[in-house]
A protein has these predicted regions:
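Alpha/beta enzyme core
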Residues: 4-9, 15-16, 20-45, 52, ...
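A glycine-rich helix N-cap at a beta->alpha junction
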Residues: 69-73
């Protein structure tokens, strides 16, 4: 018999959709939309970035889905601070969510310029953030930001970022084409 593959659906309307010009969800808007997405049957509903703004922080004071896994989005811990002392990571761990989706740099250029740390420090931030989420009982996932640009520049390092996330226990490692410039033939 044919093996049936399971496709998991992840909705990011409440986080990435909110970055659309002219869109500014209130907490009430987010609650209504989360209920609709939950009823539609999405496996995951990404609710926003707790700690980044008052709306998202308030939205994560309660779990807002019944069937769907409720996802908090945020950055990996900063280099030079322990996981237990990083306020951004603390906000994610305290959010009433089932999962944490970490956005992680996977392009060595961004590690150097945006994060101002070494490649190894970034790998450590990925590992320790995923481990902290797991220890807190959250399902960890990692968005490897600008993965394909990073892969073109330094394939070994981009893959090392994805592998660090996987080996630390991330349930999902997402290879993001952040700029949307990668053609199917290149993958």
């Amino acid at each position: 018999s044919m093996k049936r593959e399971r496709i998991y659906l992840f909705d990011t309307t409440l986080r990435d959709g909110q970055q659309t010009p002219g869109v500014d969800f209130s907490v009430e808007d987010k609650i209504v939309i989360a209920n609709m997405l939950d009823e539609f049957g999405f496996d995951y509903v990404e609710g926003g970035y707790p700690g980044a703004n008052p709306t998202d922080t308030a939205f994560f004071e309660k779990k807002r889905t019944v069937k769907s896994r409720f996802v908090a989005f945020g950055m990996t811990k900063r280099a030079g601070i322990s996981a237990s002392n990083d306020p951004g990571l603390a906000a994610l761990l305290q959010a009433n969510s089932d999962c944490i989706c970490f956005v992680a740099k996977s392009w060595d250029y961004h590690v150097r310029v945006a994060l101002g740390c070494t490649n190894e420090e970034n790998l450590e931030s990925i590992r320790e953030s995923v481990e902290a989420a797991k220890a807190a009982g959250k399902e960890p996932m990692v968005d490897c930001e600008h993965f394909f640009d990073g892969f073109k520049a330094n394939p070994e390092y981009a893959m090392a970022c994805a592998k660090a996330a996987h080996d630390a226990g991330a349930r999902w490692v997402v290879l993001c084409d952040t700029n949307g410039g990668t053609l199917p033939s290149e993958i």
